[in-house]
Curated annotation (Swiss-Prot):
It comes from Chlorobium luteolum (strain DSM 273 / BCRC 81028 / 2530) (Pelodictyon luteolum). Mg(2+) binds at T67. It comes from the Bacteria. Residues 183-253 are annotated as: Small ATPAse domain (RuvB-S). This is Holliday junction branch migration complex subunit RuvB. The RuvA-RuvB-RuvC complex processes Holliday junction (HJ) DNA during genetic recombination and DNA repair, while the RuvA-RuvB complex plays an important role in the rescue of blocked DNA replication forks via replication fork reversal (RFR). RuvA specifically binds to HJ cruciform DNA, conferring on it an open structure. The RuvB hexamer acts as an ATP-dependent pump, pulling dsDNA into and through the RuvAB complex. RuvB forms 2 homohexamers on either side of HJ DNA bound by 1 or 2 RuvA tetramers; 4 subunits per hexamer contact DNA at a time. Its EC number is 3.6.4.-. One of its GO terms (cellular component) is cytoplasm. DNA binds at R311, R316. Homohexamer. Forms an RuvA(8)-RuvB(12)-Holliday junction (HJ) complex. HJ DNA is sandwiched between 2 RuvA tetramers; dsDNA enters through RuvA and exits via RuvB. An RuvB hexamer assembles on each DNA strand where it exits the tetramer. Each RuvB hexamer is contacted by two RuvA subunits (via domain III) on 2 adjacent RuvB subunits; this complex drives branch migration. In the full resolvosome a probable DNA-RuvA(4)-RuvB(12)-RuvC(2) complex forms which resolves the HJ. Belongs to the RuvB family. Residues 256-344 are annotated as: Head domain (RuvB-H).
């Protein structure tokens, strides 16, 4: 039995459970303290003035709470949230329809905003700055521009690849924040809260074990908690004990550092198939049978954070730590392993 922690499609039941455990207020949001403290000030000031909150850009790896924070911003500002994603906005008309439907104080959340087509993105510029959009009616000699008013709103954009944002779009966000991975102690706090909402107890040692293998990511921690609940209930237990947590994690093949099957396939390919690198991400994607974007957005950030992988101008390179752990002892690596030089 195997799972891909971040790339597994989420069905309707999972989405409902995720929504159930999602914090609704800023004070219930755990972690990212500096970010949330600043947002509290910005939101309070905007409400005192009766203005829409400045547009907010949230960047960072998947599963750290960007979508949750967008919901909280809408709740704190007293507006409605309309959510979409960059790939869905493939036509300017789709974006225009959404923008003109917004009421004063509403929040428009665009996930994966870096994947929005450039032609559509340009329609956002005047909407963000002047709360208006210009659309073209007809074509050829009879074409004419029509200006439509947009109610003051807040755009919350989320991205896992902030470097792919165009400079004009990035410059229009008045508030920009980056999410960091969570330390285990904060993930424990999240797990204790989530277990209460899900109606099952969890021992502190069990929460600690799950937190330590959750890759610093609340979404993964909560998914593992739900799987541990499954094991506990099938075994007739009313509380998740440490042995139950260990049984769950072992069954899902998640090691002590939170690496899953795909992480290990990636590192095995870099270390053994490509002799430690450098290797291009396209070749790596073909080697492990995964999408290039998924490797770059989902797996690489944590492997780099964990000290196993480095990005260089020539490609991905295994660190000395990775060589020592993942090498199958091939002759091509022996000199690298013991020459005292680390790829950086």
């Amino acid at each position: 039995m195997r799972i891909e922690l971040l790339n597994t499609p989420v069905d309707a039941v999972e989405l409902r459970i995720e929504d159930q455990i999602r914090p609704r207020r800023m004070e219930d949001f755990t972690g990212q303290q500096r970010l949330t403290d600043n947002l509290k000030v910005f939101i309070s000031a905007a409400r005192m003035r009766g203005d829409a909150l400045d547009h907010v850009l949230l960047s960072g790896p998947p599963g750290l709470g960007k979508t949750t924070l967008a919901h909280i911003i809408a709740e704190e500002m007293g507006g409605s949230l309309k959510a979409t994603s960059g790939p869905m906005l493939d036509k300017a008309g789709n974006l225009a329809g959404i923008l003109t439907s917004l009421q004063k104080g509403d929040v428009l959340f665009i996930d994966e905003i870096h994947r929005m087509p450039p032609a559509v993105e340009e329609y956002l510029y005047s909407a963000m700055e002047d709360f208006r959009i210009d659309i073209m009616l007809d074509s050829g000699p009879s074409a004419r521009a029509v200006q439509l008013k947009v109610e003051p709103f807040t755009l919350v954009g989320a991205t896992t690849r902030s470097g792919l944002l165009t400079a004009p779009l990035r410059a229009r966000f008045g508030i920009s924040n980056r999410f960091d991975y969570y330390p285990p102690e904060l993930l424990e706090t999240i797990l204790m809260r989530s277990s209460t909402i899900l109606g099952i107890g969890i021992e502190r040692d069990a929460a600690s074990e799950i937190a330590g293998r959750s890759r610093g990511t609340p979404r993964i921690a909560n998914r593992l908690l739900r799987r541990a609940r499954d094991f506990a209930q099938v075994d007739g237990m009313e509380i998740i004990s440490r042995p139950t947590a260990m049984k769950t994690l072992d069954s899902l093949e998640i090691d002590e550092e939170g690496l899953d099957e795909m992480d290990k396939k990636i590192m095995d390919a870099v270390v053994n198939r490509f002799s430690g690198g450098p290797v291009g991400v396209g070749s790596l994607a073909v080697s492990v049978g995964e999408e290039q974007d998924t490797i770059e957005e989902v797996y690489e950030p944590y492997l780099i954070q964990a000290g196993y992988l480095s990005r260089t101008p020539r490609g991905r390179v295994a660190t000395q730590r990775a060589l020592l752990r993942f090498s199958d002892g091939s002759s091509a690596l022996r000199g690298t392993l013991f020459d005292g030089q680390e790829h950086v």
